[in-house]
Amino acid sequence: MGRRPARCYRYCKNKPYPKSRFCRGVPDPKIRIFDLGKKRANVDDFPLCVHLVSDEYEQLSSEALEAGRICCNKYLVKNCGKDQFHIRMRLHPFHVIRINKMLSCAGADRLQTGMRGAFGKPQGTVARVRIGQPIMSVRSSDRWKAQVIEALRRAKFKFPGRQKIYVSKKWGFTKYERDEFEKLREEGRLANDGCIVQYRPEHGPLDAWRKVQAEILNV
């Protein structure tokens, strides 16, 4: 018996049903990699950030997430280079979907019980997505903006429903807009922490404050 089409599980009808000690025997999700590209790139290297945002309240299968990830990555590697971007999948398939298997062979009516005891067995996993929630995000340099938008446009065809491509005003994956980020960086208020930054506050323990002030003055 083949896999049931994902259109049967498109809508969020029931409560979240995650894997637990009560829900065992769940198949592994098809998507296993959620960050790819130049993951270790400094926060200063990739100021551009583009999101693929869902426009519907629905469920996306782990197979669809994997297909979208592969499609986006393949286009960017071919047109930009493998070290010119960082893709991050923003959804994780935690919701378990079930299937009540029915026999379709001859004499099946004597073997199966129909809708008696119809609570199905786990079949796969999906991610529940809300309206306005990012599905995947890409950070890169400003010169690759057109290529990043085209890669996300191609990835849209792997998902059901409607999606929008949103060019963020923020610097990379940080929470600061570009003007604010550059201003805080000039003041020495930001400390690089991988693909994000940590803010150095004006308040706190006196020793920590003196240490931060000394570093800012040295900068």
UniProtKB/Swiss-Prot annotation:
For the keyword Transferase, the answer is: no
Q: What superkingdom heads the lineage?
A: Eukaryota
Q: Provide the alphabetized UniProt keywords.
A: Ribonucleoprotein, Ribosomal protein
| One Gene Ontology MF term | structural constituent of ribosome
**UniProt keyword Iron, yes or no:** no
Mind telling me which SUPFAM superfamilies this protein's record contains?
Answer: Ribosomal protein L16p/L10e
Task: Identify one Gene Ontology CC term for this UniProt entry.
Answer: ribonucleoprotein complex
Q: Which InterPro entries match?
A: Ribosomal_uL16, Ribosomal_uL16_CS_euk_arc, Ribosomal_uL16_dom, Ribosomal_uL16_euk_arch, Ribosomal_uL16_sf
- Disulfide pairs here are none
Q: Which Pfam families match?
A: Ribosomal_L16
Question: Which GO terms of type biological process are on file?
Answer: translation
Which CDD domains does the entry mention? Ribosomal_L16_L10e
Q: Which family does it belong to?
A: Belongs to the universal ribosomal protein uL16 family.
Q: Could you give the subunit structure recorded for this chain?
A: Component of the large ribosomal subunit. Mature ribosomes consist of a small (40S) and a large (60S) subunit. The 40S subunit contains about 33 different proteins and 1 molecule of RNA (18S). The 60S subunit contains about 49 different proteins and 3 molecules of RNA (28S, 5.8S and 5S).
Name of the featured protein: Large ribosomal subunit protein uL16
Source organism per UniProt: Bombyx mandarina (Wild silk moth)
